[in-house]
């Protein structure tokens, strides 16, 4: 399965954040849209980073001062690993496992068109396994009939 098909199946609108927005705004958006990360985009809608719940916990709340005034650009991951819509889902799983990340922005022509999570990929693999099991249970029944 291609990433393009996966983000179409998910059908969720991509939520993003700007580098000059505050961590409070990130937390509100993560909570409102039930997300674990947000791609960070510039004024031209190009991907410039990603911020995750883990970034906030490790880099912001570990500080002794308040996070209210901290800007996204201060704690976001700037070297973003991303995928394209034409990549295979298996490739995305391999990259996420190798890089130890749980969210992979999908970029086309420099713009974020989707966000794939490890959970999305696991859900697809689980569905594929269920389908395989269903068909494998039907197969013996069909082959037992004599062909006339």
Model-derived segments and spans:
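A glycine-centered beta-loop-beta connector
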Residues: 30-33, 38-54, 96, 104-119
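Short, flexible active-site loop motifs that bind/organize anionic cofactors or intermediates
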Residues: 13-16, 46-47, 82, 111
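The conserved cystathionine-beta-synthase
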Residues: 16-34, 41, 82-100, 107
């Amino acid at each position: 399965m291609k990433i393009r098909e996966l983000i179409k199946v998910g059908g969720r609108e991509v939520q993003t954040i700007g580098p000059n927005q505050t961590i409070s705004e990130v937390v509100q958006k993560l909570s409102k849209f039930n997300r674990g990360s947000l791609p960070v985009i510039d004024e031209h809608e190009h991907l410039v980073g990603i911020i995750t719940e883990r970034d906030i916990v490790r880099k912001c709340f570990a500080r002794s001062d308040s996070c209210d005034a901290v800007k996204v650009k201060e704690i976001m991951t700037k070297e973003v690993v991303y995928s394209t819509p034409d990549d295979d889902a298996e490739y995305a799983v391999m990259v996420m496992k190798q890089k130890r990340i749980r969210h992979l922005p999908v970029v086309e022509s420099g713009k974020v068109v989707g966000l794939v999570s490890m959970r999305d990929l696991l859900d697809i693999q689980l569905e594929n396994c269920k389908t395989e099991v269903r068909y494998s249970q039907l197969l013996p029944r069909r082959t037992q009939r004599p062909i006339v």
